[in-house]
Amino acid sequence: MQEELFESQKIVERMALETLVVDVDGFEGPLDLLLNLSRTQKVDLRKISILDLAVQYLVFIEKAKELRIELAADYLVMAAWLAFLKSRLLLPPDPSEDGPSGDELATHLAFQLERLQAMRDTAAKLMARDR
């Protein structure tokens, strides 16, 4: 029983290490939550400092060198999407642009967030399995 508790505690600690928690301009929480809130327009991206976000990402990567590179890549994709969405907000719209609409970008971002959550859930299940 204590071994199971110890193993569960190790899983929780590892998951905490694998979560990028950002603290930028009045928001503190996981990066995927920030993206979700920005997608639903509950956080104003114009107030988020991309520089602070990038610095915190680099610090996270330095601390997480022993973690899987796929995890770092997922967070890089999320940070890049956040920067891209913010740039789309700050720049005037180009009527001749054939790129994706804001709704299409938000849908793609939601898909990426669902994919990341599915990977996390699967990783937790695999870590919790009996060996």
Region locations from a protein language model:
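Long, charge-dense, low-complexity tracts
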Residues: 1-131
